[in-house]
């Protein structure tokens, strides 16, 4: 999970991406994909505001709709089989923006690596993709406080025959290792001693499950949430117990949040006010629970502290 945040849990630029720590995919990749996004994109492109704190919230209220950048990653933000927008971030966005006076949300699907470039080029108004907060991304966008926290987990064959519990086990047991495009898990594995050239990169957790089931790899690394969900119907694979990856020898817990353009501090602050109220009332968990989130994923982490990492 987007992983959901990782080498950019969306590619080296993903809701997970690689950065000076374990960032998630390198956020600068995806410029090419941005071109495609612009071609396909929205008919309406918002203009940047020079007003202190930005005036986007006022404009969204007047329009009655907010455009959400999503990456098609279950359970964070995706279009379901009925063609409807759903996922933890879009559903949370519906609740928060309704409270802020914006009645509708409109999806703008793109690659994970194009989310930040797309946001900053006005292709959409906010990133709603469960994106991990890290220092590299904080240089390009501003984040709300995290609406969830996340540990890592592995997909392994039933019974976990190699006894893989964390990245150090992958190295010690010379396990064949895979993870997703731009996932922060790339950085975590390299930090533990896995050679980057030995990592099999696949599009997402479904492809990772398929690789494990087909015995192409011994293990696929993702977020505890995404691995837990994707193996539910598998007869050949299981998810390991969640664990914290080590960064500079210290356990790391990631947090996912909504991203905004750096000029739109007023919108970010208003969003945070409503998010804090949802956390305090317990409504946040009720909104996220249908997507596999539990009390263990609730968090008091702040964007400020995660941006320092």
Identify the role of each PLM range.
Residues 1-22, 30-40:
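N-terminal secretory signal peptides
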Residues 51-129, 139:
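Extracytoplasmic small-molecule ligand-binding "clamshell" domains
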Residues 59, 157-176:
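Flexible hinge/capping segments at coil-to-helix
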Residues 44-48, 184-199, 239, 272-309:
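Ligand-binding clefts/hinges and TM-proximal coupling segments of bilobed small-molecule sensing domains
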Residues 149-153, 234-272, 294-309:
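Periplasmic-binding protein-like
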Residues 131-139, 188-190, 218-252:
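A ligand-binding cleft/hinge motif common to bilobed small-molecule-binding domains
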């Amino acid at each position: 999970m987007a992983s959901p945040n990782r080498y950019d849990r969306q590619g080296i630029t993903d809701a997970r991406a690689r950065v000076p720590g374990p960032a998630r995919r390198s956020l600068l990749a995806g410029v090419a994909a941005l071109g495609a996004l612009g071609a396909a994109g929205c008919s309406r492109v918002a203009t940047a505001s020079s007003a202190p704190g930005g005036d986007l919230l006022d404009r969204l209220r007047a329009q009655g709709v907010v455009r959400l950048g999503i990456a098609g990653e279950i359970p964070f933000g995706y279009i379901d089989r009925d063609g409807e927008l759903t996922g933890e971030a879009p559903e949370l966005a519906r609740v928060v923006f309704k409270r802020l006076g914006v009645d509708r949300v409109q999806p703008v699907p793109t690659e994970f690596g194009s989310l930040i470039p797309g946001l900053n080029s006005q292709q959409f108004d906010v990133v709603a993709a469960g994106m991990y907060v890290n220092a590299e991304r904080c240089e390009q966008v501003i984040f709300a406080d995290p609406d969830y926290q996340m540990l890592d987990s592995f997909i392994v064959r039933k019974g976990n025959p190699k006894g893989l519990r964390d990245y150090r086990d992958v190295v010690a047991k010379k396990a064949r290792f895979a993870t997703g495009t731009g996932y922060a898990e790339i950085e975590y594995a390299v930090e533990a001693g896995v050679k980057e050239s030995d990592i099999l990169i696949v599009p997402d957790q479904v492809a990772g499950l398929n690789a494990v089931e087909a015995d192409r790899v011994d293990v696929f690394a993702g977020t505890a949430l995404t691995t837990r969900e994707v193996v539910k119907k598998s007869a050949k694979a299981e998810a390991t117990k969640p664990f914290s990856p080590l960064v500079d020898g210290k356990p790391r817990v990631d947090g996912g949040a909504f991203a905004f353009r750096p000029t739109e501090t007023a919108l970010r602050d208003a969003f945070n006010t409503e998010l804090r109220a949802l956390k305090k009332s317990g409504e946040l968990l009720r909104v996220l629970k249908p997507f596999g989130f539990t009390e263990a994923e609730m968090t008091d982490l702040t964007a400020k502290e995660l941006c320092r990492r």
